[in-house]
Amino acid sequence: MASNPEERNSDKQKALDNAISQIEKAFGKGAIMKLKQNPVEKIDTISTGSIALDSALGVGGLPKGRIIEIFGPESSGKTTLALHVIAEAQKKGGSCAFIDAEHALDVLYARKLGVSTDDLVISQPDTGEQALHIVEYLVCSGAVDVIVIDSVAALTPRAEIEGDMGDQHMGLQARLLSHGLRKLTSAVSKANCILIFINQIRMKIGVVYGNPETTTGGNALKFYTSVRLDIRKIGVIKDKENITGNETRVKVVKNKVAPPFREAKFDIMYNEGISKLGEIIDMGAKLGVLEKAGAYYSYNNTRLGQGRENVKTYLKTNKEVANEIETKIRDLLRNHDNSIIIDEDSEQLLEESVF
């Protein structure tokens, strides 16, 4: 028996080396290693198409090799956000797939958001099992960067489709997802792709205290996701009497790669998607790139206009100024590790119950 600490440490190291050697013989080289042999200096990400949301995520976008969930009420912008992620991935030369379980993808709208629909791989599966098998094949190919499943609620188990309309099928979808995610999690990590689940909200019956909202598909998806985004419409944007878009808020209710409970606000314009000009104005004022006095906005002692919509019109016609402001905003965020100061609304999230 070793008589001093150094000899004991040496014996432990020999035992560990022997164990590692046996594991590699049994499971192959690379099955186990010390972290310094495979260091990760920076998380690889894909932009969401929103400057504010990229900042709120803390790493500059959605992390690759992870499972993401985007959930919210109807017509809140879930699919729009997912399509923007696809467009950003394609700009980097990535391949993307869209599993249209709802059979409701608007191809013309996707093109307006910048998605190259000619290069987009699309599937409209008949059952939930078929959808998850297709996803597994795509992930294991290692050739796809982003896969979007729209939506979890539409992943109908085969037994439910083949049964009668009034039959009760308790927990079938939850078991389907639980089994599928157990297989997909490691495959997604090895393939270094992003798997996005779009999910809907349901109401719990009989809840008096606390949040009655929940998402479909059971609890498995909540555990396996690295990032969960709660997207909501908080207002409308009007041009005189016509409604031209929605004011949108996204809360990062779960984040395994950066501090959670941050939020981002941006505009989603009809037939246009996320308004980059609106974000430039809001983020510019927040970070001090733009000067705001009352309703007036200024940049480098030049008045841009009165009111947010007038400033958006100015920046739309003066693209060089808009690009210059955007560059300064991104530089500031990069110098602060893509994180902005959490505002009062975000601080309140720490005290809310997240389902």
UniProtKB/Swiss-Prot annotation:
CDD domains in alphabetical order: RecA
Keyword set includes Protein biosynthesis: no
GO MF term (any one): damaged DNA binding
Localization (cell): Cytoplasm
InterPro entries the UniProt entry points to: AAA+_ATPase, DNA_recomb/repair_RecA, DNA_recomb/repair_RecA_CS, P-loop_NTPase, RecA-like_C, RecA-like_N, RecA_ATP-bd, RecA_C_sf
GO cellular component: cytosol
Annotated Pfam families: RecA, RecA_C
Superkingdom, taxonomy of origin: Bacteria
Binding locations of ATP: G72, P73, E74, S75, S76, G77, K78, T79
Major localisation: cytoplasm
BP GO terms, sorted: DNA recombination; DNA repair; SOS response
Alphabetical UniProt keywords: ATP-binding, Cytoplasm, DNA damage, DNA recombination, DNA repair, DNA-binding, Nucleotide-binding, SOS response
Cell cycle recorded as keyword: no
PANTHER family from the UniProt entry: MITOCHONDRIAL DNA REPAIR PROTEIN RECA HOMOLOG-RELATED, RECA
Homology family: Belongs to the RecA family.
Reported function: Can catalyze the hydrolysis of ATP in the presence of single-stranded DNA, the ATP-dependent uptake of single-stranded DNA by duplex DNA, and the ATP-dependent hybridization of homologous single-stranded DNAs. It interacts with LexA causing its activation and leading to its autocatalytic cleavage.
Name of protein: Protein RecA
Organism: Wolbachia sp. subsp. Drosophila simulans (strain wRi)
